[in-house]
């Protein structure tokens, strides 16, 4: 039986990752993303890029406002009995009581070379601080923000323009 994977992400940055997992035959059981929000000048309600691609790929998705103290989502994930959760720029901190709900834990794909630029907006912070290089870190999620052990990383040079 294929591993059950939970995917958690929101912005356009996550779309190629979810598409790649799907196209390579990984069993994405459910996607979690931020709920639709008002944006742009007209304050039109827009769904996240991950919700859009989940609909296109016909993957079940959930859009809880928060996971903190959310018994419904906790019970859902407990019942799902997934093997692994992959988190990419989800936009919410995963509560510590959720971290034991998968067999192999939660991993985070973070857009910086940790420990540098923990937290939100690591790409923008690298550019604003004129860093010469940045990268991607894959880490296990712990109960502190972007502080679990790094499993792997990939560095790239930041070029002018």
Give the location of each predicted region:
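One-carbon transfer enzymes
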Residues: 1-161
């Amino acid at each position: 039986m294929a591993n059950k994977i939970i995917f958690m992400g929101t912005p356009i940055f996550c779309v190629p990752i979810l598409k790649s997992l799907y196209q390579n035959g990984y069993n994405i059981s459910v996607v979690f993303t931020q709920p639709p929000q008002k944006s742009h000048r007209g304050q039109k309600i827009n769904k996240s890029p991950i919700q859009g691609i989940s609909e296109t790929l016909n993957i079940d998705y959930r859009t809880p406002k928060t996971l903190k103290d959310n018994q419904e989502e906790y019970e859902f994930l407990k019942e799902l009995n997934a093997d692994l959760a992959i988190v990419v720029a989800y936009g919410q901190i995963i509560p510590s009581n959720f971290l034991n709900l998968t067999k192999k834990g939660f991993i985070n794909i973070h857009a910086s070379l940790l420990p540098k630029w923990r937290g939100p907006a690591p790409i923008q912070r690298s550019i604003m601080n004129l860093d010469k290089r940045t990268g991607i870190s894959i880490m296990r999620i712990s109960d502190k923000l972007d502080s679990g052990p790094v499993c792997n990383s990939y560095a790239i040079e930041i070029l002018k323009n």
